Amino acid sequence: MSFEENITIAYQPLSVFKVRPVTRCIETMVGHTDAVIQLAYSPDGKRLASGGGDMAVRFWNTSSNTPQHTCTGHRNHVLCTTWAPDGSVFVSADKSGEIRIWDPKTGTQVGQPLTGHKKWITAIAFEPLHLDPLCRRIATSSNDQTIKIWNIRTGQCEDTISGHTGSIECLRWGGKGLIYSGSRDRTIKVWDPDGHSRSKHKLVRTLTGHGHRINALALNCDYVLRTGAYVLGKPVPASPEEAKARALERYTEVVGSDGEKLLSGSDDFTMFLWHPETSKTPVERLLGHQNLINHIAFSPDGRYVASGSFDKKVKIWCGKTGRFLSTLTGHVGAVYQVAWSADSAHIVSGSKDSTVKVWSMKDPKKALFTLPGHADEVYGLDWSPDGTQVASGSKDRTVKIWHN
């Protein structure tokens, strides 16, 4: 039985602006002395942050593509990072289990490291801006099988959530306040961190069906949660209340009446699409990849999903139903990461084969451009929120900026 049936995609961009595909490298930024593992643009796109094997976090200015700050203090590889949705701070966590908070304007560390996890950190998630416009709380997951809730203003751990029987590999903090965690124990758990049961938090439900560990989670609202109140061409909100209102409006528009959708990807070569707020029964099981699924991402408008696999392919699926739409072939090594343009019209993929490929949703079967230049595997990848550039980070210790 073949799952490679090709279906015509009726693509209609919902974005108010059009992103042109990136076609060339305009800058190779050096400074890291080991592999660049993590790469992320700030919500307003004005800064880029990178982290990796050299234990340093670096901030880069995206208008001049020059280094701004080098932040040292980590005592092991920087494994995961995230921006606050208002861009005020950047959080990084390492293999020793320490979490550090940085002021991107000055490059200085804010407060003391957050310690308490017994093993390395696997993921960090901020509480959404429309739930807390002051961006005070983060959740972290670890190889120690726990989730911790921290107040980054006070530096205190507010809660430790237990229940998984294996390392927690991925984490999301959803727009309704629920936390989703995927684990080596083959389950996804849905938590209410402010639950009113006897314990401070409560397990809402457990989602089962995968035959192997969960590698990746994605929400259909990831993009709007990440960018908060920032909208290209609109002035920045003047107050936290205004920011909260705009962030809520953006969230509501993307999830619509259908609600939040969660996608899980696994070592078992499959994905499941869920309505995690209301049901433990999956909407759909997504079959077709021939190897483990490494990364998944909803398009910013929530209508599509891209998945990257060790089978060297990127696949496109319907974000509402989970229906298979297209296979993007061309990479000759495992696909480590995928990223969407802000208008949901293009995808970039980074691979073990040392290339970045650009794909168009109008005709996704063949890569629009192949961007060579890295001397080794491409681990980190992000498309700037304003759509003007893509950043890639590699085992070759460089960060490359690609432009149209």
Report each predicted region and the residues it spans:
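Conserved strand-to-loop turn within each blade of WD40 beta-propeller repeats
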Residues: 50-54, 92-96, 140-144, 181-185, ...
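Structural hallmark of WD40 beta-propellers
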Residues: 46-49, 67-69, 87-91, 100, ...
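Loop/turn segments within WD40 beta-propeller blades
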Residues: 39-45, 82-87, 125-135, 165, ...
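WD40-repeat beta-propellers
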Residues: 57-60, 99-103, 124, 147-150, ...
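WD40/WD-repeat beta-propeller blade N-cap
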Residues: 29-36, 72-78, 96, 114-121, ...
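Intrinsically disordered, low-complexity acidic/Ser/Thr/Pro-rich linker and tail segments
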Residues: 1-38, 222-260
